[in-house]
Amino acid sequence: AYEISECLVGAEMCIRDRPMIEIGGMPILWHIMKEYAYYGHTEFIICAGYKQEYIKEWFANYFLHNSDVTFDYRNGKNEMIIHQTNMDLWKVTVINTGYNTMTGGRIKRIQRYVGNEPFLMTYGDGVCDVEIDKLIEYHKSHGKFATLTAVKMAQDKGVLYIEGGSVKSFREKNMADGAPINAGYMVLEPRIFDYLTDDTCVFEKVALTKLAEEGQLMSYIHTGFWQCMDNIREKNMLDKLLQTGKAPWKRWECQTPLVL
């Protein structure tokens, strides 16, 4: 939730950051969080910066907007009664990591909130049907510092050079059509923070490149669905998948309301 983007969807992008652009009536960030929650991961740290106040306000009102309530203003009560809620049982920490901070610097700034445990990390503008539990199992099996999910997509992005599952280098797209790209959905060991310097550090160009050079970056090849949202065409495509009930990443069911 940290990328300053062009006006993706006209006026909508001018008032909110890309992760808060809605698909199917909810921010794409919410869809990503629902994916992780499906596999039991319900504690989130959001690296906010540009339009960070919008993200905080959205979560501040999340409980209210997902609950049936009565507002009683009679006799000067000014009372709010909550009857039932469809609230997700999450813990969400939103950190202002700065307006101009680069990706690596943003991750560095949340170090004290992460602690000394391995953690999951992804970008706030792409959805995927990768099986998170299998991704974690794979990461544990090789013992390296970092694992990223790699997909083969026709995207205008840098591609990965991989040997035996190990990411060796990053290259420009025109050098290798059909080569896998970094889709996010990473598992990172706390040692990753040693590769991050200051606010000018670009995670992909500095940390991941150094990890690849040292043989500490592995790839998890995903052959299923992945799609980022870089433009209006991709937003409309994701909207259509949700409207037709064909969104591969939407594994969760509607929650049963909790009566209070």
Where are these regions (language model features)?
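Short, small-residue-biased leader/transition segments that mark boundaries at the very start
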Residues: 1-15
